[in-house]
């Protein structure tokens, strides 16, 4: 996946990063990041993070059986957990809605949860975009502006809880901001923050709100080049 990711970035995207020391060189960890661009966000992580990682991705943007099959195959090879978004299916074209059944939603979510926990149990690095949607997406996004953030969904916190229960080990969650300078070549700026731990928060909701606030603050920071 890393090699394939380099192809579309030639002369289109440069990446700078700050706070990489917060990303552990080994051991289980979750990066909870802003989602701004449907393509460039993942490519920016490939450029900045040397360690192998796995991204929780959506499949509901597929518009044909061929694209669904191809992306499913690639994601399975890369061991990237796949989820579906119910609102994306309902808002999509009729052809896309026929690719998935209502019963697929819980099946995909449960499979993604199990795979994510398994990856963390293998001391892997997992990247999650808790907003669920980028600001820029040619298929569909509920966001209406470049500066808009959506409420964070609880998936990353649930994954951390389940993994910790299985491993009997704390999983660091690294809030990560993303911002871009546009032009003929886009400049991606990744800003990694200090890790937080589930044990430090009285409730899941407080953890989610803290991480969401940290990601928003980190995304506002202009990295000096």
Specify the residue positions occupied by each region the protein language model found:
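Helix-to-loop junction immediately C-terminal to a conserved catalytic motif
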Residues: 4-36
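Structured helix-beta-strand junction loops
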Residues: 11, 26, 77, 122-123
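Generic preference for hydrophobic
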Residues: 17, 31, 55-56, 173, ...
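Residue-level detector of flexible, active-site-proximal loop/helix-junction positions
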Residues: 22, 62, 87-89, 180-182, ...
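Residue-level preference for short coil/turn positions at secondary-structure junctions
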Residues: 25-27, 51, 121-122, 169
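Catalytic core of membrane glycerolipid acyltransferases/transacylases, capturing the structured
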Residues: 26-101
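Non-catalytic C-terminal accessory region of glycerolipid acyltransferases
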Residues: 97-225
């Amino acid at each position: 996946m890393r090699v394939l990711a380099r192809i579309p970035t030639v002369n289109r995207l440069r990446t700078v990063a700050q706070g990489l020391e917060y990303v552990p060189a080994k051991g289980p960890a979750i990066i909870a990041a802003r989602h701004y661009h449907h393509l460039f966000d993942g490519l920016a992580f490939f450029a900045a993070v040397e360690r192998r990682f796995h991204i929780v991705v959506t499949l509901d943007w597929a518009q044909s059986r061929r694209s669904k099959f191809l992306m499913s195959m690639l994601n399975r090879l890369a061991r990237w957990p796949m989820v579906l978004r119910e609102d994306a299916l309902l808002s999509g074209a009729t052809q896309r809605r026929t690719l998935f059944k209502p019963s697929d939603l819980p099946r995909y979510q449960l499979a993604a949860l199990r795979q994510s926990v398994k990856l963390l149990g293998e001391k892997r690095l997992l990247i999650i975009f808790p907003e669920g949607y980028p600001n820029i997406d040619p298929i569909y996004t509920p966001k209406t502006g470049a500066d808009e953030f959506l409420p964070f969904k609880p998936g990353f916190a649930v994954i951390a809880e389940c993994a910790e229960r299985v491993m009997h080990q704390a999983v660091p969650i690294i809030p990560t901001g993303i911002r871009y300078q546009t032009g003929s070549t886009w400049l991606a700026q990744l800003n990694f923050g200090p890790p937080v731990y589930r044990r430090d928060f009285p409730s899941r909701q407080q953890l989610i709100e803290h991480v969401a606030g940290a990601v928003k603050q980190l995304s506002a920071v202009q990295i000096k080049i």
